[in-house]
Amino acid sequence: MFLLPPGFKIAPVLTDPLIQDPVGVTFDGNGRMYVLEMRSYMQDADGSTSRQPISRISRHEDTDGDGVYDKHTVFADNLVMPRIAYPLQDGVLLVLETDNRDMYKYTDTDGDGVADKKELFYAGAGRVTNMEWQPGGLTWALDNWLYMTYNPYRLRIAPDGKVLREETEPNGGQWWSAQDDYGKTWWVDGGGEIGPVNIQAPIAYGAFNVADNFEPDFQVPYPVPGGIADMQGGMNRVRLPDGTLNHFTAASGVEIYRGDRLPKDMLGDLFFNEPVARIVRRAKIVVTDGLTQLRNAYPKSEFVRSTDPLFRPVCIVNAPDGTLYLMDMYTGIIQDAQFVGAGSYLRRKVEQYELDKQHNWGRIWRITYEGMEPDRRQPKMYSETAAQLVEHFNHPNGWWRDTAQKLLVLKQDKSVVPALKTMARTSANPLARIHALWTLEGLGSLDAALAREMMKNADPKLRIQGIRASETLYKARDTSLAADYKALVKDPDPNVVIQAMLTLNLQKVPGAAALIEQTASASSVRGIKEIGTQIIKGGNSLGQRPSLADTGAGGVNLTVEQRRALQRGESTYKELCFSCHGADGQGAPMQGAPAGTTLAPPLAGSARVNGHRDYVIKVLLNGLTGDLEGKTYGTAVMVPMGSNTDEWIADVASYVRNSFGNGATFITPAQVAAVRKETKRPQPWTLAELLPTIPTALTNSAEWKLTASHNPAAAANVTSGTPGARWDPGAPQAPGQWFQIELPEPARVSEVVIESALPFNFGGGGRGGRGTGPGAAGRGAPPVPAPASPGATAAPQTGAPAPAAGAAAPGAPPAAGAPAGPPAGRGGGRGGPPASGPIGYSVQVSTDGTTWGAPVAQGAGQTPTTTIAFTPVMAKFIRITQTGTASGSEVWGVARVSVLQVAK
């Protein structure tokens, strides 16, 4: 069943029926094991019961020290696929369920092993989306911050019990997280086929990677030949002729071995699982000139391989007994239902091998080595004094050290501060010194003198810890530490120099950018040059990120809310989308497939992405499957994201439409809500189904007949093509002013776009820029006005640029010195006063020009562009009536107009 390197053994710790579908394990301070059981996961190919509250967190205890768990309780039952079960104090767990936005604290108050109290711990830790893309696997790191996958922030429990939050870059992790002896957090990406991600620095400092993160072919797995080829990526992911996986597709469950009951050459090695390949990978971490590279410890082989098609390793953890515990869901289907759609390659494989009938099992395995027995000592940390906990910092097993530090920080017992300071200064064990240092930091008892001593230590690893720990003091306004950081960019060890640069950047120390650039330029060490250059270039760390008040790329002025929307959208893109669409929006290459094959379609320069907003909205809400114009992609399906909020959809859509060289209008939550309301669809679109529902601009404007209630002779200016020409009523805005379009033949219209201010073309481009080419506002729609010059009024939230300096904002009188407007009966040609959108509008349609129904749309206009969308309706005549009253001499103008239709 299993193939392991010589000397290694694997044996069950727990199996079904005591547990089912185990996906993760944690241990509390007394060594009791908590198992996350996703008992509802993929009970059939459609995942029809996945969200039923039948999952649990079970607790298991070895009461006599023989290595066998003999006491079992259900700590928390009736859960929806739990993702986090993290122990704090005795009987206290942090719990996060699937599709729950909030993390809770569960407490067993009477000691029976069953939680009987539930309290909110942190609101907003979770999300509602595809279950594979939700946070999980919490780590209390060396720095006393809590990290979990996906979320672009870290949490901390303050001494008063409050939960603090600090932003980080998105970590890229999918399932579980880990840390090494020096507090570097580790993550693995699954769906993006990457494996370990962001490996060059702790994620708190940024998402740093280099081209050679991995040795050649590191992402190629080596399963036992004779697989059943059940890969979501189809034949592109099948190694022929043996039917096994040819590239990572589902890496998960990361761990750094830090125990003491396996061979010493394993210490510090990285372990993660590939459940589609049925393997566990062991990787050597090699640091050269400050840069990390991962290498397969068993070239063209693996640490654990299995011949059993139901072997599904998803998580691996250090255990209190010094060994590694391996979680095996032991199930048929490992992908979520959205990737096993009817008619898909994977669905056919599931049906062929009846994988949908293989579930409700599970195993937890212990990996040992010949001649090295597991440590049978049972932890009893909950009953130990603070002084006894400090002694565990000398333990050779990292689990004991981490747990003791966590409990000391939670206790906030400062009676051990003198002992900790002595240990930090004098212990012969460097790891004990590091834990003592960080425990002092967690107790609020670290002082600058000790931090500086560490920064001057002969051991570069201790110098790095001194820098990192001192950041708490710098943030507390001890800015004298800036001089220490700056001095350390000249350290002889490149790893120390890199840490100094990271700290200077993250803490935004004055003069940091120039010093980092100078250091990177002057150094011949590759790591210093690479990381320093990435810091200065920006985009992968928070330190150099512009503030919301800064002017955007391309000279475009955005509102604060638009800039926030871009930042939220960027964060989500880096969390979820990049792994398939690529960090540059060009589509992530599908390794091993024919040249040019990507996991998902390119977003950069896409006419559909830059086209009408409904395309992006509908794809995000409902998903997209099948080929796109004859081209297939590795993921085969864009899963629906409609479980997210309207704001979430709008943020992501606005980001991709204004990044990677794209330039299109912003999308608002209201626009998403309107599409959501009209689109009731349970399955993803195909392109053939979707395109007929996307509005396209009528191209026969030369045949339109235009008229108006006031100044009708000028109405024809709108389609004349004469630069600067427009229609306006020749008087301030007042109810009853209307502008009418007669089409040459009836059309199924759904939208009217009115541009009131003439476009100003000052160039632009880049992220955040507004395109001026066809399709910027919608497929075939007229161009969106180019960016206003610096100093122009802030743009309205529709995403349209602001009017030029001196133009009136909507609903406001003209700027001082501006013309008051033309005399009644005049105007409408070139050179008139600045015009704005309608204060209010009402749209009616008719098929004969005589019979007019109730308004199909009503609302408030915007300047310079008013977009009016409504339920598709057959119309030959379209009348837009102005309904508001100007407070001054504000004139309604129409410079250009477009009418959009849908096929169905």
Regions found by a protein language model. Name each.
Residues 1-388, 399, 409:
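Beta-propeller domains with acidic blade repeats across secreted/periplasmic ectodomains
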